[in-house]
From Swiss-Prot:
It comes from Mentha piperita (Peppermint). This is Flavonoid 7-O-methyltransferase 1B. The gene is OMT1B. Belongs to the class I-like SAM-binding methyltransferase superfamily. Cation-independent O-methyltransferase family. The keyword Methyltransferase applies. InterPro entries: COMT-like, O_MeTrfase_dom, Plant_O-MeTrfase_dimerisation, SAM-dependent_MTases_sf, WH-like_DNA-bd_sf, WH_DNA-bd_sf.
Length: 344
């Protein structure tokens, strides 16, 4: 091995040894609200100013910001012309940090490390087990409440931020998919946030948010959204289109087939469709900038929900065909997930 290659390999090994640090420090920055502060200021901020705003040591904060700037989360900049900082170091937001604000994916980052097993923590024991209850066993969310470290508010905020970002991508990059659609059922739609965004963007839609009775009982009224309680394993309300967002990756292939059969029964045979919004993993080397995140999400599902998984195109084709659909189309929406249209 050439000396340079060996040096690069050694550096990579060292980086893996400290790999947990990046996730931990990014989470800390979000907890302190640093991305939001830099975004709201709209101009570079000095370390003393930033330290005062978040009530922490300027020296320690500088070391953290130096680390995050190296990794492209923030950027070190020259002091603005009107600065009176006396040689202080200044930092500004980046496109990445803008995605880490509370209105973007910041709440999702805060979820990391709060689960019973840290999200994505796949141990040798995990790989050896043929059956193990994960974070949620048999769809029983009560276990979430039992862990003193785990906060249901953090979890809900994280899921809401994920849904908000993905729904925005659906609206921007898949708007044509809702043309001519009169009614839409969001299966497992929780409190209706994604559906309310879709109804607002496409006001001709009649939105039906379908979830378990205990979820529907806690939902607040939303304009253009009707809440219906039930089980997706039994029957689903009739509509022109059924949507499954972040649902099927929680379940085994066999369970997915059963869910998809119920969805197929709910839509018109000639003009209906089922929209699946989930990750599609690339295995042919033609992935995009989200491939690494999709693979990370897959092992996170393995760690926290034993049957959960992200699927490849071939794996999606298998369960869709098994459920009896005539054909399906995968559409890129420029985010972690894709839209899969399945036609009965």
């Amino acid at each position: 091995m050439a000396p340079k290659e060996d040096s690069l390999a050694l550096a990579e090994a060292w980086n893996h040894g400290f790999g947990f640090i990046k996730t931990s420090i990014v989470k800390t920055a979000v907890e302190l609200g640093i991305p939001d502060i830099l975004e709201s200021r709209g101009a570079p901020v000095s370390i003393p100013e930033l330290a005062a705003a978040v009530d922490c040591s300027a020296d320690r904060l500088y070391r953290v910001m130096r680390f995050l700037a190296y990794h492209g989360i923030f950027k070190r900049t020259e002091p603005p012309p009107e600065s009176t900082g006396g040689g202080s170091v200044y930092y500004a937001q980046t496109l990445v940090s803008r995605r880490l604000t509370r209105e973007n994916l910041g709440p999702f980052v805060l979820l990391q490390g709060t689960m019973r097993e840290p999200s994505g923590c796949v141990t040798a024991e995990t790989l050896r087990m043929s059956k193990r209850p994960g974070l949620v066993d048999d769809n029983d969310s009560d276990r979430l409440y039992e862990d003193p470290v785990f906060s249901m508010k953090v979890f809900r905020d994280a899921m809401a931020s994920h849904a908000r970002m993905t729904t925005a991508a659906v609206i921007e990059n898949y708007g044509e998919g809702f043309l001519g659609v009169g009614s839409l059922v969001d299966v497992g739609g929780s409190y209706g946030m994604a559906l309310s965004m879709l109804v607002k963007a496409f006001p001709w839609l009649r939105g039906i948010c379908f979830d378990l009775p205990e979820v529907v009982a806690r939902a607040s009224p939303l304009k253009g959204v009707e809440f219906v309680a039930g089980s997706m394993f039994e029957s689903i309300p009739k509509a022109d289109v059924v949507m499954l967002m972040f649902v099927l990756h929680n379940w085994s292939d066999e369970e997915c087939v059963e869910i998809l059969k119920r969805c197929k029964d709910a839509v018109p045979k000639n003009k209906g469709k089922v929209i699946i919004i989930d990750a599609v993993i690339d295995e042919d080397g033609n992935g995009d900038e989200f491939t690494g995140a999709r693979l990370g999400l897959d092992v996170t599902m393995m760690a926290n929900m034993f049957e959960g998984r992200e699927r490849t195109y071939v794996e999606w084709a298998h369960i869709i065909n098994e459920a009896g659909f005539r054909r399906h189309v995968v559409k890129n929406i420029k985010t972690l997930e894709s839209v899969i249209e399945a036609y009965p």
